[in-house]
Amino acid sequence: ISYSKHKMVPKKDYSKTNKKLYKASNPLHLIVLKKKIRLLEEINDYARKLDLSVKQVSVSLNGNFQNIEIIKEGGNVFYDSRPLVRMNVSVSVEKKGKIETGSYGFGGRHMYEKLFETKNWKNAVDHAFNQAYKKLSAKEIPAGEQTVVLGPGWPGILLHEAIGHGLEGDFNRKKTSAFYDLVGKKVASDQVTIVDDGTIPERRGSLTIDDEGTPSQNTMLIEKGILKGFMHDRLNAKLMNKTSTGNGRRQSYSHIPMPRMTNTYMLSGNHEHEELIKSTKKGIYATQFSGGQVDITSG
C-alpha cells in the first residue's frame, strides 16, 4: 500500500497492516505487439498439429492495469496498483460431421511472462483439445436425480453461486439470503470449511486493499459445517454492528461499494480424490462448468 495523510491524522494506518501485493508495473507496456502475435501463431500451429480432427483454434491474450486512488473521510488517501492478465484457448474438433468445442483459460494478477511460458500455454491447449475430443464420444445421461462428485477448479462456480453470494452481508441484512439467521448453526457437513481470502498472491480476487481502502483478509465463512459469519463492506458492517472484512467492491468509481467475494473456496478435507469416486456407486463426475445463477433466497 502507498499511503499519505491530508489535513487530519488517521485513526488507523492501514499501510502497516498488510503487504502491497503488486508492483506498479503495467503488463500492457512490457511486451511488444509483435511478440504477442508470434505467441498466438505458435499456439495455433501447436493446436492444429495435435490431431487431424482439429478444425478451428481460437486464442485470446487479455491484459488490464489499474491505478487505484481512494480518498476517504478525514483526508486519508490510499493508492494501489492492480495488474490482470489472462489467456483463453478454444479448440474445435470434427469427426463424422459432429463438431465439438473445448476451452481452457488461465491467468491472474501478474505480468505476461507466465502466459508466455511454453509449458503453461501447452497445458491450456491440451486441456481444451482433450475436452473437445472426449465430447465427440459423450453420451446423454438419463434424466432424474443423480449423485454428483465435483472435480477441482471450475466446478467451484457452484460453490460461488449457491453459497458465496448467499454469504454476502447485504443480502443477509435485508434477509433475502437463505443464511440470514443461521450464524452459529450447522449448515453443511463437518467436512465443509469455506473461506474468502483476498490475500493469496496473484489470484484474480486478491487485492492489497478493497475498493474502500480496507486491507484484504482471510475470512472464515463456514468452519466444519458451522456458519461463522458473512462478508462485509464498511456500510454494511456498520449497519450490522460488525467490522468490514475487506470485501468492499465496486464496478467502477461511479458505482457505490457493495460486499462482494474475493477468492471464495472450500478447504481440502480428509478424503483422497479416489475415495470420493469409490464411495459413489453410480453418479456423475463433473470436471467443468461454464457458469450459472442461483436463487440465494432458496439456495
Predicted features along the sequence, with ranges:
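N-terminal small-residue-enriched
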Residues: I1-G299
